[in-house]
Amino acid sequence: MTLSWPLPENDPWSTPFAELLMHKLELQPGDSVLDIAAGGGVPAFHLAEQVGPEGSVLAVDIHHGQVLRSRSIQGQNMPWLQFEVGDMRFLPPTLPRFNRITGNLSFMFFRPNRFEALSNLVQFLKPGGQLVLTFPSMGTFDSLWILVDEEMKRRNLEKERKALNEYIEERPSANHAKQWLEELGLERVEVTEWPLEIFTRS
């Protein structure tokens, strides 16, 4: 069967990370999924199609505009997929537990207190569940960040440049993530640094 909601081919940034996420995710029809920092729905739409009507996907993003855009794209399709506004660092304790928690390019937004945010997130994972997060770790994509910084400088975006440089300076490493997950008591912790091609225009 041809998927109706594949990962978008025209997104050179989110899709490569989402492909890695799907490669690592052990997803079954009927699973319940919490997708954090869902953005424009990559890979929430794809996840919802995979779990089917017996499952559920709650996709959370802090930006109201992103949520409205994703709902507009969804229309009446896949009613078991729900987009909601929320801060993944401070999710309400009334949320249920999920079989899977995913976050594509989300871990970078946990700053400044990543361990505390991760600890809050893990409490929503069912026993035996799986957490899969993708993020550009320390020492990766440095040539890309230089290009972004140069473009921001050209546009006089000094506030944005400052925020970017703060992020670059305090990026977590893969070992940081592994240590934090183990401290939180997760089992079978696997941290992979996967080479990705992110196309840029010079």
PLM regions with names:
Residues 128-201:
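Conserved catalytic/acceptor-binding region of the Class I
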Residues 99-114:
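A short SAM/SAH-binding and catalytic strip from SAM-dependent methyltransferases
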Residues 115-130:
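A short glycine-rich, Lys/Arg-flanked "PGG" loop and its adjoining helix->strand segment in the class I
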Residues 12-31, 46:
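Conserved alpha-helix/loop element of class I SAM-dependent methyltransferases that forms part
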Residues 1-12:
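Class I SAM-dependent methyltransferase Rossmann-like catalytic core
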Residues 52, 110-112, 125-127:
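Helix-to-beta-strand junctions that scaffold the AdoMet/dcAdoMet cofactor pocket
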Residues 89-101:
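A short acidic, Gly/Pro-enriched loop at the edge of an enzyme's catalytic core
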Residues 32-91:
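Class I SAM-dependent methyltransferase SAM/SAH-binding core
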